[in-house]
UniProtKB/Swiss-Prot annotation:
Task of the protein: Catalyzes the formation of 4-diphosphocytidyl-2-C-methyl-D-erythritol from CTP and 2-C-methyl-D-erythritol 4-phosphate (MEP).
This enzyme's EC code(s): 2.7.7.60
Positions marked as site (Transition state stabilizer): R15, K24
Homology family: Belongs to the IspD/TarI cytidylyltransferase family. IspD subfamily.
Gene from which this protein is expressed: ispD
Catalytic activity, reaction form: 2-C-methyl-D-erythritol 4-phosphate + CTP + H(+) = 4-CDP-2-C-methyl-D-erythritol + diphosphate
GO biological process per UniProt: isopentenyl diphosphate biosynthetic process, methylerythritol 4-phosphate pathway
Organism this protein belongs to: Chloroherpeton thalassium (strain ATCC 35110 / GB-78)
Region forming the signal peptide: none
Name assigned to this protein: 2-C-methyl-D-erythritol 4-phosphate cytidylyltransferase
Pathway: Isoprenoid biosynthesis; isopentenyl diphosphate biosynthesis via DXP pathway; isopentenyl diphosphate from 1-deoxy-D-xylulose 5-phosphate: step 2/6
HAMAP family from the UniProt entry: IspD (MF_00108)
Amino acid sequence: MQAIAIIAASGVGKRMKLPSGKTKQYLKLGVYPVIYYALSAFQQASSVEAIFVATLPSHIAYLQKMARRYGFHKVKFVIEGGKERQDSIFNCVEKIREVYGDDGALQDKVILIHDGVRPFIQPNEIDEIAELSKSFGACVPATKPKDTIKYIDGDDNRFFGETLDRSKLLQVQTPQGFRADLIMSAHQKAQSDSFYATDDAALTEAYFPEQKIKIFEMGYHNIKITTPEDMDLGKAILKRLRQSK
């Protein structure tokens, strides 16, 4: 079994409050840009045969140069992303279809979809998710929430509603893995219906409700760089990961 990775790197990161033209995936975290670490992990993962990256048009040449410079030979295509994250994933799905064709070349393969701003995923975790995706059809990493979670009052959003049972909740992350034909079909259907979901797992749930999604319990290191505070936390995680190797 070989996996194909899709890296979503088209976001502009409004919550990061960056100057115009700058995006969070290219901020320096230690020596390298945030996205470097994600690409490096997928390059090292033995289950991954090819990486497709969706990014802003102005960053395509930069990412291609990065892949050459650091020997990320699994990065096969860097293409233009879409208006929304889901559009970017769809663009990569269509590129995969174009490259592999519909003659069975994708049979027994899985597709792993990852956020380019989750730099701390580890190669062994990628391999485990790929294997579980193959075995169960779909697999998504998640962590247990540390905080109490409450609904907002439905009648007045200035107040809380009921408290949720934390033991039945998980915070979902990436990479999310799926049997190739399953996720490609889900994206094609969603594109036809102009339907948008919060992530690829939700898309699968919408179009293939019979497909159970295996839980892969992840540690708390696999954060998504979203706000300025995440960069400070990221530096601490990077230091700890380096010390543990």
